[in-house]
A protein has these predicted regions:
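Internal alpha/beta loop-helix hairpins
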Residues: 1-63, 86
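Non-catalytic connector elements of ABC transporters
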Residues: 40-42, 50-164
Length: 164
C-alpha cells in the first residue's frame, strides 16, 4: 500500500473506495474493503442506542458493545463492527474500566510470525476472533497458551461501524 498517494479499491469492476492507504485501512467504507485490505474481525449486530459520537451495538455473538460512530445511525439498524486484530488486547482478566469492550473465550490457535503472533480465539458464543500481539519477549516466555481461557478487550474507538 506504499506504491501510491491514493488507492482505488474495486469489486467486480465497480470502484468502491478511493483514499489514502491509512484511510482505507483504518476507515474502510464497506465490509468488502475491510476484508480485502487486511486481517479483520467482523461482528454483526443491531444499533441499540445512539449517543454523542457513540453507539451501543447488541450482538448475539459478542453481547452489548460500545463503538464510536457517526450520528446518522438509528436504533434498529443492522451494522457490522470492524476490528483489526492489532487493535485488540488479550489477557487473563476482564477490563478494569467500565468503558472497555470485552469478550471471553478460549485460545484455539497461536500463529507465530516472528515480530508478532496471531491468536485465534473462540468466544463463548462460538464466534472466532483474531488478536495480533507484538512479540516483545522471547517466544518461550509467552504466558498465554492454546486452550487457555482469556479475555479480549478493546476501546470503543478501536473499531469502525459499517452499514454495508
Amino acid at each position: 500500500m506504499t506504491v501510491a498517494d491514493r488507492i482505488g479499491v474495486m469489486d467486480r469492476g465497480e470502484l468502491i473506495q478511493v483514499a489514502t492507504a491509512p484511510e482505507i485501512y483504518e476507515q474502510p467504507n464497506s465490509r468488502w474493503v475491510a476484508d480485502f485490505i487486511g486481517e479483520v474481525n467482523l461482528i454483526e449486530g443491531t444499533i441499540a442506542e445512539v449517543g454523542a459520537g457513540e453507539v451501543a451495538i447488541e450482538s448475539p455473538a459478542a453481547g452489548c458493545l460500545r463503538a464510536a460512530a457517526p450520528a446518522e445511525l438509528a436504533p434498529g439498524a443492522t451494522v457490522w463492527l470492524v476490528l483489526r486484530p492489532e487493535k485488540l488486547r488479550i489477557g487473563y482478566a476482564p477490563p478494569a474500566g467500565p468503558h472497555e469492550n470485552c469478550a471471553a473465550g478460549k485460545v484455539a490457535h497461536i500463529g507465530y510470525r516472528g515480530d508478532f503472533s496471531i491468536y485465534k480465539l473462540q468466544l463463548d458464543s462460538g464466534l472466532v476472533m483474531k488478536a495480533a500481539v507484538a512479540n516483545t519477549t522471547r517466544a518461550t516466555e509467552h504466558p498465554i497458551g492454546v486452550g487457555d481461557r482469556v479475555w479480549l478487550t478493546w476501546a470503543p474507538e478501536a473499531g469502525v461501524v459499517l452499514t454495508r
